[in-house]
């Protein structure tokens, strides 16, 4: 559907009862408000709907709280999970007095990033392809009270359940630590669930490809077809929503926390990127690994700004429990063809149209609109300023001698470091008014609240290490 009239015709012919308007907050979570169909007409889509922005963390103060949700009718689809027929529509957030995009709206930032590309003349389209991993548990308990702090996770797949009593017996098929990549059922216990997740995403407009079990016990990944920056961020929101919903229907619970389990692999979100112009791939050329000079400069920009990028690509305190050596996490800021230990990988392909950069340090806790936009702006800064990424590193970086390893820069070691890096290095984000300084400052304040709570809260491991000191 491309016009409000088409949406209204669809509503009538499909007996739609409600329209659900959705938008993304600065932390990356979908929010929504549902309207009875008697409220929906052409003006509903043309004029937008007012709401209170002061209730959204990181947005307006209560004395200037009015904001406007403007539906993007091209995103309209029937939500497959609601009992009453409900049309879901993704919205942009506007200033009600001017009708201009709100500077702190993540989707608005992503749209400005695409406009910025076209204004430079370097390209007309930027494609993104995220690979977001996640865990599914049968039972999760956690508490963060001053006198009772801890968590407990359970899944039928966990190796610790080898002697657990189950109704009907313990059937014994269990994935070992770091042994979960690609096994068939019954070791893979979630085949049908993942298929249902993929099917529900397709119903909501996402372009789907595949699904499989991941390395850790209870860890999974579904594949989305790459798309333009804003569309792909929209689809990743659908991806997360459908995974949460289907897991819930199965009586299970999904999480996109980067590192919920100590000692096993964490969940990453490798992000493939490429720029096109006039229907031709800008990243294909005759340089290293058949890349263009522009692509190498793009990589140079990502590596140069990686520490400030971490504030958007790895925005949780938990993100930095994944970004440690030894768990397939790409902490070293280098690039290579096919080498998965480098933070920027060039996937092998003979097809010039498939030439792309895979940035491997992001995780699924990221707000996709902000993460994709920031990665793109860093790469564009590399192209515009011809930033040399240095020589490629084709050997296994984790096997380098300590002296050589110290010469390679790394991603941040904590969210505090990432936010401090963003405070110092953000001029590249301000170009084209894509990110506004006001948003960056408010984002840092918002995330620093999380850092402060985490740093001030005693941890169970500290009791284990220090209680008897």
Swiss-Prot record:
Record-listed E.C. numbers: 6.3.1.2
Record bears the keyword ATP-binding: yes
Activity regulation as described: The activity of this enzyme could be controlled by adenylation under conditions of abundant glutamine.
Residue positions binding Mg(2+) 1: 131, 270, 358
Compartments where located: Cytoplasm
Ranges of residues in domain GS beta-grasp: 14-98
Catalytic activity, reaction form: L-glutamate + NH4(+) + ATP = L-glutamine + ADP + phosphate + H(+)
Keywords: ATP-binding, Cytoplasm, Ligase, Magnesium, Metal-binding, Nitrogen fixation, Nucleotide-binding, Phosphoprotein
UniProt-listed InterPro entries: Gln_synt_N (IPR008147), Gln_synt_N_sf (IPR036651), Gln_synth/guanido_kin_cat_dom (IPR014746), Gln_synth_cat_dom (IPR008146), Gln_synth_gly_rich_site (IPR027303), Gln_synth_I (IPR004809), Gln_synth_I_adenylation_site (IPR001637), Gln_synth_N_conserv_site (IPR027302)
Cofactor: binding details: Binds 2 Mg(2+) ions per subunit.
PROSITE patterns: GLNA_1 (PS00180), GLNA_ADENYLATION (PS00182), GLNA_ATP (PS00181), GS_BETA_GRASP (PS51986), GS_CATALYTIC (PS51987)
Sites where the protein binds L-glutamate: 265-266, 322, 328, 340, 360
Quaternary data: Oligomer of 12 subunits arranged in the form of two hexameric ring.
The protein, known as: Glutamine synthetase
Taxonomic source organism: Azorhizobium caulinodans (strain ATCC 43989 / DSM 5975 / JCM 20966 / LMG 6465 / NBRC 14845 / NCIMB 13405 / ORS 571)
Gene this chain is encoded by: glnA
């Amino acid at each position: 559907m491309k016009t409000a009239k088409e949406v209204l015709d669809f509503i009538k012919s499909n007996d739609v009862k409600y329209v659900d308007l959705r938008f993304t907050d600065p932390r990356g979570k979908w929010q929504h408000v549902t309207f009875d169909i008697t409220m929906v007409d052409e003006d509903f889509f043309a004029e937008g709907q007012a709401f209170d922005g002061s209730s959204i963390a990181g947005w307006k103060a209560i004395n200037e709280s009015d904001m406007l949700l403007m539906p993007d009718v091209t995103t309209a689809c029937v939500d497959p999970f609601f009992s009453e027929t409900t049309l879901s529509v993704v919205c942009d957030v506007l200033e009600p007095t001017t009708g201009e995009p709100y500077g702190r709206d993540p989707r608005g930032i992503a749209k400005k990033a695409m406009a910025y590309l076209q204004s430079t003349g370097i390209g007309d389209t930027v494609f993104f392809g995220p690979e977001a991993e996640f865990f599914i548990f049968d039972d999760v308990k956690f508490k963060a009270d001053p006198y009772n702090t801890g968590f407990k996770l359970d899944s039928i797949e966990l190796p610790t359940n080898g002697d657990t009593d189950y109704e009907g017996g313990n059937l014994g098929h269990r994935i070992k630590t770091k042994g979960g990549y690609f096994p068939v059922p019954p070791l893979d216990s979630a085949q049908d669930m993942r298929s249902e997740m993929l099917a529900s995403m397709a119903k909501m407009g996402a372009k789907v490809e595949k699904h499989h079990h991941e390395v850790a016990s209870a860890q999974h990944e579904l594949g989305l077809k790459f798309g333009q920056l804003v569309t792909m961020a929209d689809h990743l929101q659908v991806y997360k929503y459908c995974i949460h919903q289907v897991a819930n229907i199965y009586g299970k619970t999904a999480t996109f926390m980067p590192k919920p389990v100590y000692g096993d692999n964490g969940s990453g979100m490798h992000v493939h990127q490429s720029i096109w112009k006039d229907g031709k791939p800008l990243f294909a050329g005759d340089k290293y690994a058949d890349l263009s000079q522009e692509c190498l400069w793009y990589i140079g920009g990502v590596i140069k700004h990686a520490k400030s990028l971490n504030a958007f690509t790895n925005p949780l305190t938990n993100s930095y429990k994944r970004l440690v050596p030894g768990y397939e996490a790409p902490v070293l800021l280098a690039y290579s063809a096919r080498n998965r230990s480098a933070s920027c990988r060039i996937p092998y392909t003979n097809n010039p149209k498939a030439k792309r950069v895979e940035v491997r340090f992001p995780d699924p806790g990221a707000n996709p609109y902000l993460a994709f936009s920031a990665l793109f702006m860093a790469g564009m800064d590399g192209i515009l300023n011809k930033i040399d990424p240095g020589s490629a590193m084709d050997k296994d970086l984790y096997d380098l001698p300590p002296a050589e390893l110290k010469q390679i820069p790394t991603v941040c070691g904590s969210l505090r470091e990432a936010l401090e890096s963003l405070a110092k290095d953000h001029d590249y984000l301000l170009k084209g008014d894509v990110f506004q300084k006001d948003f960056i400052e408010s984002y840092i304040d918002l995330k620093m609240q999380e850092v402060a709570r985490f740093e001030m809260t005693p941890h169970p491991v500290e009791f284990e290490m220090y209680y008897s000191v």
